[in-house]
Amino acid sequence: MQIGQRLGTPLSPSATRVMLLGAGELGKEVIIALQRLGVEVIAVDRYPDAPGHQVAHRAHVIDMTDAAALRALVEAERPHLIVPEIEAIATDALAAIEAAGLAEVIPTARATQLTMNREGIRRLAAEELGLATSPYAFADSFDAFSAAVAKIGMPCVVKPVMSSSGKGQSVVRSEADVKAAWDYAMAGGRVNHGRVIVEGFIDFDYEITQLTVRAIDPATLATRTYFCEPVGHVQVAGDYVESWQPQPMSAAALQKSRDIAHKVTEALGGRGLFGVELFVRGDDVWFSEVSPRPHDTGLVTLASQRQSEFELHARAILGLPVDPTLGSPAASAVIYGGLDERGIAFEGVRDALAVPGADLRLFGKPESFVKRRMGVALATGANVDEARERAKRAAAAVRPVSSR
């Protein structure tokens, strides 16, 4: 099938089939964007009734780190495209699936392998591409970790080489923190337990996500790189709590950010949207990480852009033209679960939506935890400051409550 020139009808022999590996809140929005273009979507996750399961044509629950189970599901469903949305996947199996011609992996199987592992992407960025990064070292034992901390110096940031949403991430500020940081990283890694990256601490002014799209240029039919306006964000313990767009920054810093994003995404190749995380101080910019898929901080684009990051990703992977134009300054603020319980309810929704320019996304996760992201408030404004105030006010109005 020549995807882009021709799209089929879902649930028919002509269907264009896309399988998402990971069906959380970001995957859910990608599924909705794909379905608006008439794509048949298969959602896969490790637990039942995930947000994306609730809107997909078909849903499956498997251990995606089980290579045999993943291969069997792909052979049964025969998707045209496989779109990884999380880190905990048997990436070697994806490479074998792509090599066998069973499906195309987005953006590529190699890109998925590199970016699911902080070691792979850091070595690519710093050692192959020569991009500015913080000093770093890797360790796979406590003794090696202690030596790495001594080499990098304190304060330093410790992360499992494979984790998401800040899991296992901490800052070592003194010798008293070293053992606790190692133990926390060991508990937080999804796969590849036992290996961490130790990063030197950069005294940055702010962090941004440079959403970068590799998509078709309709004039030439060649792959072209497009940039969204920079997304500013606040993270607590490595997990995003607030984001806004556009982030004010100097012309020099913006150009450096886009140069870095272009180099790393071009090296990864393929089609789709990438979230490139960067540290900025004045006109200086450092590469941090890259995700080859929509980024949690990019939820703000549901309110800010003509096409959200999810629509951009859907169009790009299907070989369709994209438009990353900013429509309005906007912001997002996270709504946490606040309690440990299945099937919670939300009060204050009417009050939240009464905030001028505000909107909500309640993700529909079947189980809440105190610090689990259960929704997000969005808001537009005349400027970023107004949008941030509105988004935070709307988020604060929503009260997760027990349904018992």
Swiss-Prot record:
A Pfam family that the UniProt record links to this protein: ATP-grasp
Chain sites annotated for binding Mg(2+): 277, 289
One GO BP on record is: 'de novo' IMP biosynthetic process
EC class, as a word, reads ligase
Cite the binding residues for N(1)-(5-phospho-beta-D-ribosyl)glycinamide: 25-26, 85, 296, 365, 372-373
Reaction(s) the record says it catalyses: N(1)-(5-phospho-beta-D-ribosyl)glycinamide + formate + ATP = N(2)-formyl-N(1)-(5-phospho-beta-D-ribosyl)glycinamide + ADP + phosphate + H(+)
Q: Name one GO molecular function term.
A: phosphoribosylglycinamide formyltransferase activity
Output the superkingdom of the source species. Answer: Bacteria
Which InterPro entries does this UniProt record tie to the protein? ATP-grasp (IPR011761), ATP-grasp_carboxylate-amine (IPR003135), ATP_grasp_subdomain_1 (IPR013815), PreATP-grasp_dom_sf (IPR016185), PurT (IPR005862), PurT/PurK_preATP-grasp (IPR054350), PurT_C (IPR048740), Rudment_hybrid_motif (IPR011054)
Q: Where is the ATP-grasp domain?
A: 123-318
Q: Which residues bind ATP?
A: 118, 159, 164-169, 199-202, 207
Identify one Gene Ontology CC term for this UniProt entry: cytosol
Pathway linked to the protein: Purine metabolism; IMP biosynthesis via de novo pathway; N(2)-formyl-N(1)-(5-phospho-D-ribosyl)glycinamide from N(1)-(5-phospho-D-ribosyl)glycinamide (formate route): step 1/1
Where does the sequence pass through the membrane? none
Q: In UniProt terms, what function does this protein have? A: Involved in the de novo purine biosynthesis. Catalyzes the transfer of formate to 5-phospho-ribosyl-glycinamide (GAR), producing 5-phospho-ribosyl-N-formylglycinamide (FGAR). Formate is provided by PurU via hydrolysis of 10-formyl-tetrahydrofolate.
**Subunit field text:** Homodimer.
What's this protein's family per the entry? Belongs to the PurK/PurT family.
| HAMAP family tied to this protein | PurT
What's the name of the protein? Answer: Formate-dependent phosphoribosylglycinamide formyltransferase
